[in-house]
Amino acid sequence: MNTDNKILYTYENLEKDSEGYLKKTKDWNIKLAEEIAKRENITLSSDHWKVIIFVRKFYFKFNITPSMRMLIKSIQKEIGKSKMNSIYLFKLFPKGPAKQASKIAGIPKPVKCL
């Protein structure tokens, strides 16, 4: 029982689409990201967080979730080509960097993702 009168939000009781993406970006927080990542079998490292924060900033700046191509080009400009290439991003997010990072970041699925 919650005795401090705070509403506890967990992934289960938040509104999501059929694939598990949050419907309301304002519901996202760091703890929720960790919970979603755990469900995706990902242990978040500092590089995961760089990508997650990057896609959130991108979404709120341009009002669109970056596609894979857009993600790679944009993140390489900001973080550097040597590290954030497609091979490395797939190691971080094996089910697809744009798709999986967006889900963990609490933003909509990229339009071009199947």
UniProtKB/Swiss-Prot annotation:
Query: From the Swiss-Prot or TrEMBL record, what is one GO molecular function term?
Result: transferase activity
Keyword line: Cytoplasm, Transferase, tRNA processing
Top enzyme class: transferase
For this record, an example GO cellular component is: cytoplasm
Catalytic machinery residues = C113 (cysteine persulfide intermediate)
Q: Give its localization.
A: Cytoplasm
Keyword Magnesium recorded: no
What this chain does, per the record?
A: Part of a sulfur-relay system required for 2-thiolation of 5-methylaminomethyl-2-thiouridine (mnm(5)s(2)U) at tRNA wobble positions. Could accept sulfur from TusD.
Instruction: Give the similarity note.
Output: Belongs to the DsrC/TusE family.
Quaternary structure and interacting proteins, as annotated: Interacts with the TusBCD complex. Interacts with MnmA.
What is the protein name for this chain? Sulfurtransferase TusE
Q: Which organism is it from?
A: Buchnera aphidicola subsp. Acyrthosiphon pisum (strain APS)
Organism lineage reads as: Bacteria, Pseudomonadati, Pseudomonadota, Gammaproteobacteria, Enterobacterales
What gene is this protein translated from?
Answer: tusE
